[in-house]
A protein has these predicted regions:
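Basic, gly/Ser/Thr/Pro-rich low-complexity segments located predominantly at protein N termini
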Residues: 53-55, 173, 183-186, 228, ...
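Accessory "access/gating" subregions that flank catalytic or transport cores
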Residues: 97, 101, 105-224
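Generic recognition of cysteine residues
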Residues: 80, 94, 177-180, 228
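C-terminal regulatory domains involved in ligand/effector binding and gene-expression control
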Residues: 2-153
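A structural-propensity feature for long, helix-poor, extended segments
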Residues: 1-12, 203-235
């Protein structure tokens, strides 16, 4: 509303009982003239992973060029075997050089979300009155031994990011908001416990992005389309 309000009065009407057959995540935009008569309308759907689609054509409303020539893991694996290169090197071959600056920003955002989540306490926004628990689990896990500690810390890191998402904090969709804690938790733990360099983390993110893109191209990363495992399973 803040974006459109300067041009004309804006009202958002929620209709939770209306089910749109094309996709559950839909929004109808209606424009009215000064007399309140409808002048135009547009229905668009958020189909997951940042993609928008219209019911008539089902295609993305934003046309973006293909970055990767190969769209299956089999093709990419064969390329890696043929060239002796890794998955992240395939990403390097296809992307522009600024991809590494972008992934650096992604990594910084992930780390910040973990740290904020571990430091924050209190009740999460919403009617359920759920308390944040990441900091408690982190303290508990720190007292465990060996493998139990490792698993406990990863869980605490993932929960920290998920709680940041639930409170409206800045997170990275990996590949979605619903699964935003898994990838940063694993990478954060690897850097803390195994001293992985930022370079190795960025290569891991490039690989993760490649795999996520393959799934999005051939199946779905949308929980609304394919259930929660489309999000968490891909992560």
């Amino acid at each position: 509303t803040e974006t459109l309000q300067p041009a004309a009065p804006v009202e958002i009407i929620w209709e939770p009982k209306i089910f749109l057959p094309f996709h559950p995540n839909g929004m109808k935009f209606v424009s009215l003239d000064s007399e309140g008569k409808e002048t135009d309308q547009w229905t668009v759907f958020s189909v997951g992973g940042g993609a928008l689609a219209e019911e008539n054509d089902g295609a993305s409303s934003v046309n973006t060029p293909d970055v990767y020539e190969m769209n299956s893991m089999t093709e990419i694996l064969q390329w890696c075997e043929r060239t002796g290169k890794s998955y992240w090197e395939y990403v390097k071959e296809c992307e522009e050089s600024d991809i590494w600056d972008y992934l650096q920003e992604v990594w910084k955002t992930m780390q910040a979300a973990v740290k904020r989540g571990l430091d924050s306490e209190g009740v999460l926004p919403g009617p359920l009155n759920l308390r944040r628990k990441a900091s408690t689990y982190y303290i508990r896990a720190s007292g465990y031994k060996a493998s139990l500690q490792s698993r406990g810390l990863v869980f605490a890191y993932a929960l920290a990011v998920s709680e940041e998402n639930a409170s409206g904090g800045v997170i990275v969709t990996a590949p979605t908001c619903g699964s935003c804690g898994i990838v940063p938790a694993v990478l954060y733990h690897l850097q803390k416990s195994r001293e992985f360099s930022d370079t190795r983390i960025l290569r891991a993110l490039a690989t993760a992005g490649l795999i996520g893109n393959i799934v999005k191209t051939n199946a779905s990363i949308s929980g609304a389309e394919a259930g929660c495992q489309a999000e968490v399973g891909v992560a």
